[in-house]
Amino acid sequence: DKVSVLERFDHQLQESGLNTLHTIKPDFSWASTDISEIKNFYKFDKYILLFPFCSPHLTIKKWPHYNKLIELISNRFGDKYKILTAPGPSEINDAKDINALALLDNGKALDISQLTSLIKNSSFVVANDTGPAHITAHVGAKGLTLFGKHTTAYKVSIERENFKAIEVSDLNNLSAEKVFEKL
Protein backbone atom coordinates (compact mmCIF):
# COMPACT_ATOMS: atom_id res chain seq x y z
CA ASP A 1 0.00 0.00 0.00
CA LYS A 2 1.54 3.30 -1.11
CA VAL A 3 -0.85 5.56 0.81
CA SER A 4 -0.14 6.52 4.43
CA VAL A 5 -2.44 5.45 7.23
CA LEU A 6 -3.66 9.01 7.87
CA GLU A 7 -4.39 9.57 4.18
CA ARG A 8 -6.41 6.34 4.11
CA PHE A 9 -8.24 7.38 7.27
CA ASP A 10 -8.93 10.84 5.84
CA HIS A 11 -10.35 9.28 2.67
CA GLN A 12 -12.63 6.94 4.65
CA LEU A 13 -13.97 9.80 6.76
CA GLN A 14 -14.58 12.00 3.71
CA GLU A 15 -16.40 9.14 1.98
CA SER A 16 -18.62 8.98 5.07
CA GLY A 17 -19.42 12.68 4.74
CA LEU A 18 -17.38 13.81 7.75
CA ASN A 19 -15.27 16.96 8.08
CA THR A 20 -11.60 15.98 8.08
CA LEU A 21 -9.91 19.29 8.88
CA HIS A 22 -7.44 17.77 11.40
CA THR A 23 -7.11 14.19 10.18
CA ILE A 24 -3.84 14.56 8.28
CA LYS A 25 -2.19 16.63 11.04
CA PRO A 26 -3.67 15.43 14.34
CA ASP A 27 -2.90 17.25 17.59
CA PHE A 28 -2.90 15.02 20.66
CA SER A 29 -1.96 17.85 23.06
CA TRP A 30 -5.47 17.85 24.51
CA ALA A 31 -4.58 14.63 26.34
CA SER A 32 -2.02 16.38 28.60
CA THR A 33 -2.40 16.71 32.35
CA ASP A 34 -0.47 18.30 35.21
CA ILE A 35 2.59 16.21 36.13
CA SER A 36 4.24 18.69 38.52
CA GLU A 37 4.05 16.20 41.42
CA ILE A 38 5.97 13.60 39.41
CA LYS A 39 8.54 16.20 38.28
CA ASN A 40 8.99 17.40 41.86
CA PHE A 41 9.31 13.84 43.20
CA TYR A 42 12.01 12.90 40.68
CA LYS A 43 13.57 16.39 40.69
CA PHE A 44 13.95 17.07 36.99
CA ASP A 45 13.38 20.03 34.74
CA LYS A 46 15.18 19.67 31.40
CA TYR A 47 15.17 16.13 30.11
CA ILE A 48 15.68 13.83 27.18
CA LEU A 49 13.13 11.05 27.03
CA LEU A 50 13.90 7.61 25.64
CA PHE A 51 11.50 4.83 24.68
CA PRO A 52 13.73 1.77 24.23
CA PHE A 53 10.89 -0.72 24.56
CA CYS A 54 8.58 -2.55 22.17
CA SER A 55 5.89 -5.19 22.25
CA PRO A 56 7.29 -8.65 23.06
CA HIS A 57 6.06 -9.98 19.72
CA LEU A 58 7.58 -7.07 17.73
CA THR A 59 11.23 -7.21 18.76
CA ILE A 60 12.21 -6.35 15.17
CA LYS A 61 11.29 -2.76 16.17
CA LYS A 62 13.76 -2.68 19.08
CA TRP A 63 17.00 -0.74 18.67
CA PRO A 64 19.66 -2.31 20.94
CA HIS A 65 22.03 0.65 21.50
CA TYR A 66 20.20 2.94 23.94
CA ASN A 67 22.81 2.61 26.69
CA LYS A 68 25.57 3.69 24.30
CA LEU A 69 23.40 6.65 23.24
CA ILE A 70 22.92 7.56 26.91
CA GLU A 71 26.70 7.47 27.37
CA LEU A 72 27.18 9.82 24.40
CA ILE A 73 24.50 12.23 25.67
CA SER A 74 25.98 12.25 29.18
CA ASN A 75 29.51 12.81 27.88
CA ARG A 76 28.38 15.72 25.71
CA PHE A 77 25.84 17.44 27.95
CA GLY A 78 26.81 16.37 31.47
CA ASP A 79 24.02 17.22 33.91
CA LYS A 80 22.24 19.67 31.58
CA TYR A 81 19.55 17.06 30.85
CA LYS A 82 18.18 14.19 32.90
CA ILE A 83 17.87 11.05 30.81
CA LEU A 84 14.46 9.47 31.40
CA THR A 85 12.36 6.53 30.34
CA ALA A 86 8.68 5.98 31.00
CA PRO A 87 8.11 2.23 30.87
CA GLY A 88 4.70 0.75 30.31
CA PRO A 89 3.29 -1.79 32.80
CA SER A 90 5.02 -4.75 31.15
CA GLU A 91 8.29 -2.82 30.63
CA ILE A 92 9.09 -1.83 34.23
CA ASN A 93 11.52 -4.73 34.76
CA ASP A 94 13.17 -4.13 31.37
CA ALA A 95 13.76 -0.49 32.34
CA LYS A 96 16.32 -1.69 34.89
CA ASP A 97 18.61 -2.60 31.97
CA ILE A 98 18.58 0.97 30.66
CA ASN A 99 20.97 3.50 32.26
CA ALA A 100 18.27 6.13 32.66
CA LEU A 101 15.80 7.17 35.32
CA ALA A 102 12.58 5.16 34.89
CA LEU A 103 9.61 7.37 35.75
CA LEU A 104 6.75 5.73 37.59
CA ASP A 105 3.77 7.11 39.46
CA ASN A 106 3.66 5.42 42.87
CA GLY A 107 5.36 2.34 41.43
CA LYS A 108 3.05 2.12 38.42
CA ALA A 109 3.40 3.10 34.78
CA LEU A 110 2.27 6.61 33.89
CA ASP A 111 -1.22 6.88 32.44
CA ILE A 112 -1.72 8.16 28.90
CA SER A 113 -2.31 11.77 29.99
CA GLN A 114 0.79 11.81 32.20
CA LEU A 115 2.81 10.24 29.41
CA THR A 116 1.53 12.81 26.91
CA SER A 117 2.54 15.69 29.21
CA LEU A 118 5.96 14.17 29.81
CA ILE A 119 6.52 13.82 26.07
CA LYS A 120 5.15 17.27 25.20
CA ASN A 121 7.43 19.03 27.70
CA SER A 122 10.60 17.09 26.90
CA SER A 123 13.67 18.65 25.32
CA PHE A 124 13.99 15.70 22.94
CA VAL A 125 12.62 12.17 22.46
CA VAL A 126 14.28 9.12 20.93
CA ALA A 127 11.92 6.19 20.44
CA ASN A 128 11.46 2.91 18.70
CA ASP A 129 8.37 2.74 16.47
CA THR A 130 5.92 2.47 19.37
CA GLY A 131 2.89 4.27 20.77
CA PRO A 132 4.97 6.92 22.57
CA ALA A 133 6.69 7.75 19.26
CA HIS A 134 3.31 8.44 17.69
CA ILE A 135 2.29 10.60 20.66
CA THR A 136 5.55 12.54 20.26
CA ALA A 137 4.83 13.17 16.61
CA HIS A 138 1.34 14.43 17.32
CA VAL A 139 2.05 16.79 20.22
CA GLY A 140 4.72 18.71 18.33
CA ALA A 141 7.63 17.54 20.48
CA LYS A 142 11.15 17.35 19.07
CA GLY A 143 12.60 13.94 18.49
CA LEU A 144 13.57 10.94 16.43
CA THR A 145 12.03 7.57 15.84
CA LEU A 146 14.03 4.59 14.68
CA PHE A 147 12.69 2.36 11.93
CA GLY A 148 13.99 -0.95 10.70
CA LYS A 149 12.60 -2.91 7.78
CA HIS A 150 9.23 -3.63 9.46
CA THR A 151 7.53 -0.65 7.76
CA THR A 152 8.24 2.92 6.67
CA ALA A 153 7.81 6.18 8.53
CA TYR A 154 5.68 7.46 5.65
CA LYS A 155 3.31 4.53 5.79
CA VAL A 156 2.50 5.12 9.47
CA SER A 157 2.36 8.94 9.09
CA ILE A 158 4.84 9.61 11.88
CA GLU A 159 7.17 12.31 10.54
CA ARG A 160 6.31 15.88 11.45
CA GLU A 161 8.08 19.24 11.50
CA ASN A 162 9.84 18.48 14.81
CA PHE A 163 9.81 14.69 14.71
CA LYS A 164 11.85 12.77 12.16
CA ALA A 165 12.67 9.16 11.43
CA ILE A 166 15.91 7.34 10.83
CA GLU A 167 15.15 4.41 8.55
CA VAL A 168 17.59 1.52 8.13
CA SER A 169 17.33 -2.05 6.92
CA ASP A 170 18.62 -3.47 10.23
CA LEU A 171 18.31 -1.61 13.54
CA ASN A 172 21.14 -3.69 15.00
CA ASN A 173 23.53 -1.98 12.56
CA LEU A 174 22.38 1.57 13.35
CA SER A 175 25.09 3.02 15.58
CA ALA A 176 24.48 5.17 18.63
CA GLU A 177 26.82 7.74 17.07
CA LYS A 178 24.59 8.04 14.00
CA VAL A 179 21.52 8.61 16.20
CA PHE A 180 23.42 11.06 18.42
CA GLU A 181 24.36 13.15 15.34
CA LYS A 182 20.63 13.79 14.75
CA LEU A 183 19.87 15.05 18.27
How would you label these PLM feature ranges?
Residues 1-183:
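Catalytic machinery of carbohydrate-active enzymes
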